[in-house]
Swiss-Prot record:
One of its GO terms (cellular component) is cytoplasm. It comes from Bacillus thuringiensis subsp. konkukian (strain 97-27). The gene is glyQS. Belongs to the class-II aminoacyl-tRNA synthetase family. GO terms for molecular function: ATP binding; catalytic activity, acting on a protein; glycine-tRNA ligase activity; protein dimerization activity; transferase activity. This is Glycine--tRNA ligase. It is an enzyme of class 6 (ligase). It catalyses: tRNA(Gly) + glycine + ATP = glycyl-tRNA(Gly) + AMP + diphosphate. InterPro entries: aa-tRNA-synt_IIb, aa-tRNA-synth_II, aa-tRNA-synth_II/BPL/LPL, Anticodon-bd, Anticodon-bd_dom_sf, Gly-tRNA_synthase/POLG2, Gly_tRNA_ligase_bac, GlyRS-like_core. Homodimer. The lineage of its organism: Bacteria, Bacillati, Bacillota, Bacilli, Bacillales. One of its GO terms (biological process) is glycyl-tRNA aminoacylation. ATP binds at residues 203-205, 213-218, 287-288, 331-334. It holds the Pfam family tRNA-synt_2b.
Amino acid sequence: MYSMEQVVNLAKHRGFVFPGSEIYGGLANTWDYGPLGIELKNNVKKAWWKKFIQESPYNVGLDAAILMNPKTWIASGHVGNFNDPMIDCKKCKARHRADKLIEDALDAKGIEMVVDGLTFDQMADLMKEHEVKCPDCSSEEFTEIRQFNLMFKTFQGVTESSTNEIFLRPETAQGIFVNFKNVQRSMRKKLPFGIGQIGKSFRNEITPGNFTFRTREFEQMELEFFCKPGEDLEWFAFWRETCKNWLLSLGMTEESMRLRDHGEEELSHYSNATTDIEFKFPFGWGELWGVASRTDFDLKRHMEHSNEDFNYIDPQTNERYVPYCIEPSLGADRVTLAFLCDAYEEEQLENDSRTVLRFHPALAPYKAAILPLSKKLSEGATEVFAELAKDFMVDFDETGSIGKRYRRQDEIGTPFCITYDFDSVEDKAVTVRDRDTMEQVRMPISELKGFLEKKIQF
């Protein structure tokens, strides 16, 4: 089994992810996506948009503003209730999220337990019972558990006063809810229908960590799917299965994921069903996707605070009701990291070894690499590159032996290496090498585009 350290080292060495502000000593838990990382992440986002917006007869897209009227967050409950349980170590002054500290301590003992949803007293009792220690200094002396609001606060305009106070959004969902009527009317949508968007969110996490898994600045891919009350659990099951199948269609293995239903004590007060799709990272199981039936909570809250009517009139029955909502919420950074971890392999060959990223071709940063066998063949190889680059991200590499170039492309997940050799000048054909099998076939240059188009389908 590979370690998280191996994945992080490859990510930096090969230009997937760099530490943020590195030349100034960095900024804790900030990361910059490098040339290959942004291609991978963009491909993940494109694949999500294709499945959940483009190919869906129900759903449309939106791009709501990051900065919203502060009343939005009062209505949604974020100002009063968007908190994590915080605790400080009395000895080393390290600050921790109490529920995660307890879960990690229990996990080390082989005890699986969800602490989220317990009272502070119950958490404190668990800490004493299991002698939970500070991971930084091993002390068992902690302050009392207290609430910590996760929203980033800033000011709009030239003066810093409470009247100009605004927040960086902690989720993209509220931008969808406040635009429910705008979208429904302008697009003439009838229930059921959904609104999806991809965008940045910000949470002042107490203990971010595990590379890009938990960061204070992150990107979400969220769908809010509105339906008639009473049909919500049917749609909940539909979207839960659709989400799982999307991951499988892009090469994630069944063994590396699990669906975990929330028990009654863990459910949010507004939810009647929630399932987390979790991935087995090298550091343990972590949530990728939360699929929740949110009932009519959000639309009703915004109705109360804005005096806007979000009732829907059914054109067939003339019934009037506030729609229920199913929310599949996916972290773009988390699922990108999951695909990177799932693809990573160190393979032992007969007389050699190689590191390979077995990405689905749809996700791979480069779909192919053009490799002239000799620099004397660069002109012809460049023509092949130029033609394919109109439709695909392709690499061009003429440095080093062909074997070393193959290994470099394996390590960044390029599914196909296209070698332009001396015969190519005459027969207008190239050798195509498959990353996973390492098998090679001869193919006319004229067929390359169709070949790659077929391979990147999912």
